[in-house]
Regions:
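Terminal amphipathic alpha-helical/low-complexity segments used for targeting or macromolecular assembly
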Residues: 1-22
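Acidic/polar low-complexity surface segments
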Residues: 7, 13, 74-77, 81-83
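Left-handed beta-helix
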Residues: 21, 26-27, 32-33, 38-39, ...
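Active-site/ligand-binding-proximal alpha/beta "capping" segment
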Residues: 121
Length: 122
């Protein structure tokens, strides 16, 4: 069962977010563009997941807690390919964390308020 409304799951530049089975997206969260959320993933209040200029992938059974920002790094002169955001399975992203153009492996706990930036691998 998918719990979300069309207003908070939005297309961007021809890409519409895709969600697996039993995904929960709180009505106050926003998921935009080239985003895939794995089975049994939860996205809690006031989260922004914005795959506008690159892709975002979140594995199965992950939890994106209140107030998180998940974004990508666009291509530019110093980084011609940009950085997607890749999050593994069974990951918990603590309240108000910011993940930007990085890779987080499986079974990782990202602490509340953490910031993980472009190109980092955890």
């Amino acid at each position: 069962m998918k719990h979300h409304t069309d207003g908070n799951v939005r297309s961007f530049d021809g890409h519409r977010p895709r969600t697996g089975a039993r995904v929960l997206i709180d009505p106050s969260a926003v998921v935009i563009g080239d985003v895939e959320l794995g089975d049994d993933t939860s996205v809690w209040p006031q989260v922004s997941i914005r795959g506008d200029m690159h892709r975002i992938r979140v594995g199965a059974r992950s939890s994106v807690q209140d107030g998180c920002v998940l974004h990508i790094t666009h291509a530019g002169p110093f980084n011609p390919d940009g950085w997607p955001l890749q999050i593994g399975s069974e990951v918990t992203i603590g309240h108000k964390a910011t993940l930007h153009g990085c890779t987080v492996g499986d079974r990782v706990l990202v602490g509340m308020g953490a910031t993980i930036m472009d190109g980092a691998v955890v």
